[in-house]
Amino acid sequence: VRQDWIDYNGHMNVAYYTMAFDRALDEIFDDWLGVGADQAKELRMGPMALQSQIHYLDELKLGDTFACDFQILDADPKKIHFFTTMINLVSGAEAATYESLSMNVDLDARRSAPYPAPARARIEALLAAQADLPRPARAGARIGIRRKG
């Protein structure tokens, strides 16, 4: 966690959690799934977020290091539903989670489009490899104020 990511509360600002998750996803989408920047340049299509939610669980402070774990929860020919957990490598605590639904988009038509066959095969392979992982407890969580009584 860099100094310029720290806010007036003395911890990493929420905007940088979003940026950190986005950068981790760029690597996963590019390197693992083949649906990131290279696909956008070569095939004029790429994933766009439809919906996302972040849970802030434990503060990250100046100098903390972190990593992100990625799990595909579901996929179809055009969409990927995934869950990412940010782990504080100093304390071992879950710092945050990020759940999102993304859709492949034809960048010229600006409409949804199926993932190319090679990307779809990688998505399906990762989905199958993670099939026995437990569904994260926070996946699909609603947002709201809990009322007593």
Q: Predicted segments — roles?
A:
Residues V1-A49, D106-G149:
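Hot-dog-fold acyl-thioester-processing enzymes
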Residues V90-G92, D108:
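Solvent-exposed strand-loop boundary residues in beta-sheet-rich modules
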Residues A96-Y98, P114:
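A structural microfeature
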Residues R2, F83, L101:
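Conserved beta-strand and immediately adjacent loop positions that scaffold enzyme active sites
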